[in-house]
């Protein structure tokens, strides 16, 4: 329900939480269940299936006839209806996991995690909005630790090749345990790695796992340096920078997918953003902080959460959280402004407006979001992150039924290509950073110290209560020779952040990454094409919006 409503979701599959789930009981009877064509109807179908294995043992025989056919208009959310197939595929795969368990067995954390990822995959395929998840798991959970790392693989059959893409049937193992055999398409580089070294990426076999960012829960009072360094080595060798790290003072607390908000179970936060790239004075910054806090406090009065259980309303109203964020930071000299003073202005405005509208003052007010989408609208750097480079490309995903796709394919085919792992297309836009802006080529400790500076000056001064503060959401790009230095910094400064994610500096193993470095000559070439775009020639006589998204928070570009 939350994902279909456009909300990112954080969840825990820590062992002590998953252990509280009931034992799986095989259904002993069946009944017809008609799925209603609504957000609530789709959510109810998941609930009914799970109850069949955990409670009433009455297996639903799903009837999809009420669901609008694929391509029908979605009046409220926009875009086109996906039809019943994404939901049917989701329910079948969840049932396969449940059927694999013996009567009286318990789900493992990884199985619980995969069920949630399958739900997110159905939402994504449904085109309602890109799904964002963060999965928090126990530090000793080896299955979760490795679920987005390389598999051992063997090519069983080579079925064909076209333009450097190989069609192969592959069997894979993890720790000498057979997992599955599947027919896949792989680009030349991954084919060579599989053929020569017997290694293949996880996303060919469990693509739904890309819907979640996974993070190890690290209890600050309990972690030892040796254990931390052991887990850091796994992150380093994963090739994708996963899992991330979530340092906490209380393992019962969690966060939103991009990790800037400290949340109790069953809790929402009210987010606003300040563009600091064009702030002219301290007074200007303070004024913006007040306005953002004013807007967030008004939002905090909206707590009529239909469909959800009463504890969501109770917990959200109790702390009335705000998330006043900053973006465009890499375009300014932060030492010229007093962010602690600005945070205090936000606190005072929240207290004043909360009293006027009859809500509780917020327990936590200031944070820094990734700002992937907001920065595009504003033309700024993203949150705490540097500009990607002096010259780079930004990739945007569109559906092939959208008017912009046909227009670009007919007029400027140089900037559009097919998705490698989807049926959409990718538009490539060139970007040039402003003069004297901070770029991703900066020293990694310079970036980490900027995270620390804003944690201490902005986030900490907006903290009014709770065992964890809010956070500076950050993805750390790490060069090959920097992993040791980053490990040392993280250990020495573990009180200066809650959650961080990591990517190898070369964008890791992600194909068609959201950002990619280019040369000045490439920029000039792409720019010459961009200059020929005339959006007045693009006509939309119906809404074909494709709301499917990218890897959440990838490369400092959270698309929520």
Per-region residue spans from a language model:
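Function-dense linear segments that define catalytic or interfacial modules
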Residues: 1-87, 234-333, 555, 559
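Alpha/propeptide regions of enzymes that mature by internal proteolysis
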Residues: 34, 39-50, 85-122, 223, ...
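Secondary-structure capping and boundary motifs in well-ordered enzyme cores
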Residues: 38, 83-86, 111, 259-268, ...
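Flexible, glycine/charged-enriched surface loops at secondary-structure junctions
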Residues: 59-61, 101-114, 123-135, 302-317, ...
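Catalytic or ion-translocation cores adjacent to nucleophile or general acid/base/metal-coordination motifs
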Residues: 62-95, 381-413
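Internal maturation/activation junctions in enzymes
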Residues: 128-166, 199-222, 303-313, 321, ...
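Catalytic alpha/beta core of large soluble enzyme barrels
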Residues: 235-238, 244-308, 318, 370, ...
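Short acidic, low-complexity intrinsically disordered linear motifs used
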Residues: 545-560
């Amino acid at each position: 329900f939350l994902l279909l409503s456009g909300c990112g979701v954080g969840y825990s599959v820590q062992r002590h939480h998953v252990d509280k789930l009931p034992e799986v009981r095989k259904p002993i009877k069946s009944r017809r269940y008609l799925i209603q064509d609504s957000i609530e109807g789709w959510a109810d179908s998941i609930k009914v299936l799970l109850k069949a294995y955990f409670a009433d043992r009455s297996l639903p025989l799903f009837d999809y006839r009420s669901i609008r056919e694929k391509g029908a208009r979605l009046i409220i959310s926009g875009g086109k209806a996906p039809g019943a197939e994404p939901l049917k595929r989701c329910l079948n795969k969840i049932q396969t996991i449940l059927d694999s368990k013996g009567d009286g067995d318990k789900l493992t954390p990884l199985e619980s995690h995969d069920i949630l990822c399958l739900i997110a995959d159905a939402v994504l395929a449904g085109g309602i909005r890109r799904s964002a998840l963060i999965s928090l798991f126990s530090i000793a959970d080896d299955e979760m630790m490795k679920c987005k790392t390389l598999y051992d693989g063997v090519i069983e059959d080579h079925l064909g090749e076209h333009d450097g893409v190989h069609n192969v049937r592959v069997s894979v193992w993890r720790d000498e345990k057979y997992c599955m055999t599947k027919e896949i398409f792989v680009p030349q580089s991954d084919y060579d790695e599989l053929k020569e070294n017997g290694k293949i990426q996880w996303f060919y076999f469990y693509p739904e796992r890309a819907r979640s960012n996974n993070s190890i829960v690290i209890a600050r009072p309990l972690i030892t340096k040796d254990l931390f360094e052991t887990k850091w080595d796994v992150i380093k060798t994963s090739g994708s920078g996963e899992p991330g790290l979530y340092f906490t003072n209380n393992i019962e607390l969690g966060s939103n997918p991009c990790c800037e908000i400290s949340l109790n179970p069953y809790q929402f936060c009210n987010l606003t953003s300040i563009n600091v790239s064009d702030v002219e004075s301290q007074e200007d910054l303070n004024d913006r902080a007040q306005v953002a806090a004013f807007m967030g406090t008004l939002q905090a009065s909206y707590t009529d959460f239909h469909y959800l259980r009463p504890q969501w309303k109770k917990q959200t109203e109790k702390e009335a959280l705000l998330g006043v964020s900053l973006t465009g930071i890499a375009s300014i000299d932060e030492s010229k402004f007093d962010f602690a003073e600005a945070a205090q202005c936000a606190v005072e405005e929240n207290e004043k407006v909360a009293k006027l509208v009859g809500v509780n003052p917020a327990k936590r007010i200031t944070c820094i979001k990734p700002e992937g989408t907001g920065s595009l609208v504003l033309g700024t750097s993203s949150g705490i992150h540097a500009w990607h480079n002096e010259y780079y490309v930004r990739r945007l995903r569109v559906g092939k039924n959208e008017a912009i796709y046909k227009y670009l394919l007919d007029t400027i085919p140089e900037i559009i290509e097919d998705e490698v792992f989807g049926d959409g297309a990718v538009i490539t836009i060139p970007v040039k950073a402003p003069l004297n802006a901070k770029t991703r080529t900066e020293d990694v400790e310079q970036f980490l110290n900027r995270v620390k500076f804003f944690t201490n000056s902005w986030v900490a001064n907006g903290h009014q209560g709770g065992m964890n503060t809010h956070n500076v959401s950050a993805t750390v790009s790490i060069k090959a020779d920097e992993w040791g230095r980053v490990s040392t910094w993280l250990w020495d400064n573990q009180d200066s952040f809650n959650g961080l994610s990591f990517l190898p500096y070369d964008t890791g193993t992600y194909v068609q990454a959201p950002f990619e470095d280019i040369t000045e000559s490439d920029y000039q070439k792409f720019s010459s094409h961009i200059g020929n775009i005339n959006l007045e020639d693009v006509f939309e006589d119906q809404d074909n919006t494709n709301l499917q998204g990218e890897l959440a928070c990838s490369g400092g570009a959270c698309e929520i």
